[in-house]
């Protein structure tokens, strides 16, 4: 999505918000109700199952390209774990599409008046910009 303010009653152009015929956000292939407010993101898609195997139950299992999503219950709390793949481009897609899932009305193609804040936790490794930091 473009980095600009959109009035909540102004329709978002189809080129800026790609929703499939099934009503799912394009890259993640998810419906708005498929995610929890608490989300763990990992780079490697194999880590999704390693984490969700500890869930008490899994209600959503979706895979599209490098994006694997499991949503379920853990100790009475609804959680989503989602793989981003590699690179900042993929993370940008994931974060923008997660935001769209909770803050855009998919029927009207407008932003919701009340916004939902997601709790996103990154689990994994990252490189360093300084050679002396491993």
Where are these regions (language model features)?
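Metabolite-binding pocket within alpha/beta catalytic cores that recognizes anionic/polar moieties
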Residues: 2-134
